[in-house]
A protein has these predicted regions:
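An acidic, glycine-rich surface segment that forms the CoA-thioester-binding/catalytic face
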Residues: 20, 66-69, 93-133
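Conserved CoA-thioester-binding segment of acyl-CoA-metabolizing enzymes
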Residues: 14, 18-84
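Short, active-site-adjacent cap segments at secondary-structure transitions
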Residues: 84-88, 137
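CoA-thioester-processing core
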Residues: 115-125, 131, 137-175
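N-terminal amphipathic/basic-hydrophobic helices that include classical n-h-c signal peptides
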Residues: 1-18
Length: 175
């Protein structure tokens, strides 16, 4: 039913032809979303790509966080990733020139209207627990910084490599 679908537009124009319906109860490529007894379990599932964030995943996360926020049965969210090598290696730069990346581009937009990866960016007021097992780089910090509780395994590493690739970490909420 419509209650299971979250409508979102990567371009923020909110017109019908620009809308993408994402059914949060159906499998999504790159992220798993499961609900158990009031717990929203969110798992980044792109281990072959270092659990990096593909441009199309921004709409998925927006739909997931909207469901967490608006579903009265959800009391807490837990976000983690598959494997123990990478929690999240940030934005998948190999997809930076894709059509999905062009749709998600945030040029000429206020940050608040451009980036929707994390709970804070989606106005989630419920508690969020972030479980980090492995390396967290760049955009992966969105989830860590916005969590109420962070549980890091002994092999967790937190890296901001923006300077190494000639970028400024202007998007991540580090600080």
């Amino acid at each position: 039913g419509r209650e299971n679908k979250i409508y979102c537009s990567l371009r923020q124009d909110w017109e019908c032809d620009g809308m993408t319906a994402i059914d949060v109860n159906q499998p999504m490529d790159g992220v798993r979303y499961e609900k158990h007894n009031g717990i929203a379990a969110i798992t980044i599932d792109r281990s072959a790509r270092g659990n990096s964030l593909a441009p199309v995943m921004q709409a998925m996360f927006r739909a997931i966080w909207s469901d967490v926020r608006d579903n009265p049965d959800m009391r807490v969210a837990v976000i983690t990733a598959v494997g123990d090598r990478h929690f999240c290696t940030g934005f998948d730069v190999s997809e930076a020139d894709s059509e999905a990346a062009a749709d998600a581009v945030f040029v000429d937009k206020p940050l608040r209207e451009a980036v929707f990866w994390s709970p804070y960016q989606n106005d989630v007021w419920k508690p969020v627990i972030c479980v980090v097992n492995g390396t967290c780089v760049g955009g992966g910090h969105h989830f860590v910084v916005d969590a109420d509780i962070v549980i890091a395994s002994r092999n967790a590493k937190f890296i901001d490599s923006h300077v190494n690739v000639g970028m400024v970490g202007a998007i991540e909420n580090i600080g």
